[in-house]
Amino acid sequence: MQRWKLTLEYDGRPFVGWQRQDNGPSVQQALEEAIYRFTQETVTVFCAGRTDAGVHALAMVASVDLAREATADKVQAALNFHLKPHPVAVLRVEPVAPDFHARFSCLGRAYLYRILNRRAPAALEAGRVWHVQGGLDAEAMHEAAQRLVGQHDFSSFRASLCQAKSPVKTLSDLSVARVGEEVRIVARARSFLHHQVRNMVGTLKLVGEGRWTADDVSRALAARNRSAAGPTAPAAGLYFTEAWY
């Protein structure tokens, strides 16, 4: 039995999220079915971050145990073949120690949020960005974002159905920068609450529009109440970009 570390890229649009659910196709289901077609083994694949419906991944890390003997190149080629036509690609396959676990061994995770900030709609990037027509002040957003960096009670930025035992998280980085017509937000932490990144982005958008100040963000954080913060940004602009071990 060999444990494998898989690095995946996927378009989240056709999926109900990473995790298997009864209401539609999931990334986990697509991957486990591809593995079955390759090995005839029924397995459970674990991932570093269980993304929601419509959320994408540039480098999601997963782990799985396979009894079939094969090289890393063979596993990668077979899974990419059997994953068709799903928009999922296996970028890398590596053999790892039996105690490696994509979720529980993970020391940190990073997300990217993309806002297309222009008047014209998104023709090529529809479903992959949040289209915001009105001008956004990325520098003001970045300044306000620093109020959220560090260890805090993020109750104001967690989903109502969040199952985390504690709302306290340590945000190691939250940066905002304009790149051409895009405003890009990068968030890094050991772990995140459900919807935390999207709720922070929705709040920072209010700052970018000039409707909120950095002090308003601090007050929202201190309130420890979801209704005190901004709206939840759409799933379309969110990407899981990195997991480190």
UniProtKB/Swiss-Prot annotation:
Chain ranges passing through the membrane: none
Residue numbers annotated as active site: D52 (nucleophile)
Entry's EC annotation: 5.4.99.12
Any one biological process term the GO annotation gives: tRNA pseudouridine synthesis
Quaternary structure (record): Homodimer.
PANTHER family: PSEUDOURIDYLATE SYNTHASE (PTHR11142), TRNA PSEUDOURIDINE SYNTHASE-LIKE 1 (PTHR11142:SF0)
Protein's recorded name: tRNA pseudouridine synthase A
Organism (species): Rhodospirillum centenum (strain ATCC 51521 / SW)
